[in-house]
Amino acid sequence: MQLPNNAATNGWYNVLPDPSPAKQVSGTIRVPYVVLGAGVTGLSAARQLATHLPDEEIVLIEAERVGFGTSGRNSGFVLGNHFHGGDVPFENPALVAAHARLSRGGLNILRKLVTDHEIECGWHDWGKLHVSAGAEGDATLNGLVQGYETLGIQAKELDADEVAVVTGSSFYTAGLKVEGTTGLMNPAAMCRGLGETLPSNVTLYEISPVHRLERGQPSRLITANGEVIADHLIMCTNIFSPALGFSKSDMVPVVAYASLTRPMTALEQAEIGGDANGFGLLPAAHGGSTVRRTPDGRILMRNSFGYGPGDTSNSAMLARARANHIESIKKRWPKLQDFEMGLEIEHTWGGVLGVTRNSGHVFGQIEKGIWGSIGCNGANVARGTMSGALIADMIVGNTSDLLSDQQSVPRPKWMPPDPFRKMVARQRMKKMEKASAER
């Protein structure tokens, strides 16, 4: 069975203090409910289920440490809406609006949890800035403007000089700022905080990868040192679901790479200028770079792609991505020409996304006693949080407009198996990387 095999580094996680010792599955544990996967979806599902069923014992199992895996490896955007400019005009405006409501719901849940539990993750309601650095991006920005108008969301167009005021970079030709719909944070810190503040009737087990799953009523989840037997299993395993026998033809496992620099000195921050409180940039062009400047003065650069969970720990792919990130930072801030000798990269890592053909989602009852929320499509922090809460609502029989929105999202379209899937995916990723002058 293919288990999570992330590289032994995650920049967001590595800058945190050491966590408390992990509790691991040991012996036989018998419970009514088990949630598998403690990313944002599983954390949300376990919390919501525990709130609905305060007298029931719920187990949450994570293969690694909470925050170290996929949910702690993204760029740190909690997107209250997400679409591509190339998708405008929308083929199905009602479905796009449903996606936006679901994302906004997840954003609101997380913002409240971070505030109520005083989770230290650098949360900043900064919004997001779509940026362009050429003709492809400019055309896509026009589509984004139309899309936000369709959704009734305010967005302000920025020229090159206005973008430079924010970023300290003359690399960009235009931008589109969307206020109030995106939180910025350290995803590993946020996930750890969510795991540390779960309701008292949730028991979290970490470093407990499930080596074998015996489906049934009850289901039996077997780890190296024990087993969990549960009447109800909630699968929140995303791209690792095929290893457990689910969603084998639903997703492409795409690895996105990121690097995080050391904190800039006051002199370096003054040298590049821009908003010293931090910002978040999303590329308008496909294959462009996602960029963060953190409150402590680090630069995060995210671009370059791989295929399959194994590529998160592929040393050659990590080295290639790191070189690309250095080049991308130099393009944006040429004053840092001595980058390798000065503002060095401290961490480079990969995170694997589950991408479907049609932005579809596996949601609901998979079979008797087994439920699932699977398929992130690269925007999982807010949507995963919302879908996790909604799967718990569905299990206990609660209904809502948001649950109806979630149920309106189609199932993923069928994908061919490897090696065909891998071959096509690699060709498309290579073409996208070569075509983008905006990386």
PLM regions and their residue ranges:
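Flavin (FAD/FMN) cofactor-binding and adjacent substrate-gating region
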Residues: 2-7, 14, 84-88, 112-193
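Glycine-rich active-site loop/strand segments that organize a redox cofactor
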Residues: 73-102
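Active-site substrate-recognition segment that forms the wall
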Residues: 76-78, 116-124, 210, 227-267, ...
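Short beta-strand to alpha-helix junction loop
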Residues: 98-107, 131-140, 177-196, 205, ...
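Extreme N-terminal leader/targeting segments of oxidoreductases
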Residues: 1-33, 51-52, 56-57, 83
